[in-house]
Each structure stands twice: as C-alpha cells, then as structure tokens.
Amino acid sequence: MSSWDNLLEGKVALVTGGSRGLGRADALALADAGADVVIADIMVESDQTPTRTEQESMLAQMMKAQGVVYTEQTVEDIRKMGRRSMAIKMDVTDRQGVFDGVARAAKEMGRIDILVNNAGTVDHVARFEKQSIELWERDLRVNLTGSFNCAQAVWGGMKERGWGRIVNLASVAGIMGGFGQASYSTTKIGVIGLTRTLALEGARYNITSNAVVPGIIGSEAFKMADALNKEMNDRMRKRTAFGREGEPEDIANAIVFLCSDKARYITGVALNVSGGIELFTF
C-alpha cells in the first residue's frame, strides 16, 4: 500500500460496513494516511456483539469458509500501523443504534471527523414487475436511510468543531440504471442527491460531502460471483474502457483524497471511479 504521507494525521474516521471488501480497503487506506479508524459493522465477532440473528450467523459461517477477513482482523491490522482502532456493532437501519454507536465511538476516540458511508446491500436481482415491496423497502432502508442516519449522527459534532468530511458510496447503477436492479439503482441515485444536499448545508461549517461512484470492483463478492457466473462478469469487464475490473484500493484512494485538505474546495461531487464503464454505448 502506497503512503499518503499522513494526509489525515490526527483525524478520526468512522467506516460503516468496514470489516471486509470495499469497507476494509477504505479503513486500511485511511489508517495508512494517518487517521484513527472506527469500524462500524453489523458483523462484529467479539464480546461487543452479545446477540446475532440466525441469518447473520449463517452468513458469518459462509463468509468465514471463503476466507473473508472479519472486523477484528481489520482492527488489528490498523493497530499494527500505529493507529488507534475499535469495532462497534452497527445496523445502519436502526436509527437509535446508529446514534448510540456514534456517541460511544466519539467518547472513546475523542470525536468523529470523517464518515465513510460504505454499508449497503445488493444481493438480489429481479425484474421490476417481479420486484417485491419487501426487498424494495429493505434496499431503501439500508442503502439510503442508513446513510441518512449515519450522517445525521455525526453532523452535530462536525458542525460544532467546524470541520468534517462525509463520503457516501454510490454506484454507476444509480447513474446508468441496472437491469433487474430497480431498488438498488434508485437508492444509489438517491445517495447522490443526499450527498449534494449535505454539501450545500455543510459548507458554511467547513463540512464537505462527496460521493464516490464505483463501477465493477474486484471485491470479495465480485470474485465469488466470478466462480458462479464468469461469463456474465466477463461481459461487464468488456464494458469498461480498460477491459477489466478495478480494485478496492482504487475506491479507497479516491476516498482518502476527498477526506484530505487537498480536496478542501471540493464538495457535492459524484466522483466516478468506474474504469469508464458509463461511457459504453453499444
């Protein structure tokens, strides 16, 4: 991992969904840039997690079998860099739980300067006419309301201190649409709208708000999908200008930049980190 020369020295970041995939890459990159990092995730394996649903337990076992790194390992890796880190269990759809978790993290770490809204869900594909209202509402709660909850929870502290950075994870599906992804695409364009509103309202308090817009990224989930349907993934690769997927570090590097003072005059931007997939016309 390349050094960012302590661009974020002295800052405290909170990354939702930070235990694996893009969230883990984001957390490690922020730490590499000098930040202390709080990992907020629904899948936390420790005495901080007194209960777990049957579904969560099944998912944990499945992902563990695939060699997925968990929250505690990410926290340990950050501490090895000489940064402070802690893990908190957080369901971003649980509004009170989000506020309680942020308050606890701020108390233990001193404050929250940076929020990366990475937590999200995209685990089903259904044509619009077959889309269930239950899955539609779940995607809205996780991807859009979850980002809203977390941003509100950190907003007061950022406003009081006169400095803050919010980065929301959107998707090219929000810009281009996605076949069989009515709910997911809708939530991701909604995230961009939320991002721009926060930018307008936050500027007077020196709070910037930006979105990073990934295309196809070689995350753990993408690699698992490769094993199931490589032909489909190859078609997606060919739609990018580079003919390949990006890496989680490509997203993480963009986030570090947007959180740094080098991007202090950038706000309300939806930054495509997509390999040019949105340029594909035929």
Task: Map each language-model feature to its residues.
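Residue(s) in the substrate-gating loop at a strand-loop-helix junction
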Residues: S171
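Short C-terminal tail/terminal secondary-structure segment
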Residues: S2-W4, V125, M176, V256, ...
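Short-chain dehydrogenase/reductase
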Residues: M1-M109, D123-A126, E134-L135
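Alpha-helical segment proximal to the catalytic Tyr-Lys
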Residues: G156, L200-R204, R264
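A conserved structural motif in NAD(P)-dependent oxidoreductases
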Residues: T240-I251, K262
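Active-site helix of classical SDR
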Residues: A151, T187, T195
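Substrate-binding pocket helix/loop in short-chain dehydrogenase/reductase
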Residues: A126-F128, S132-L140, M236
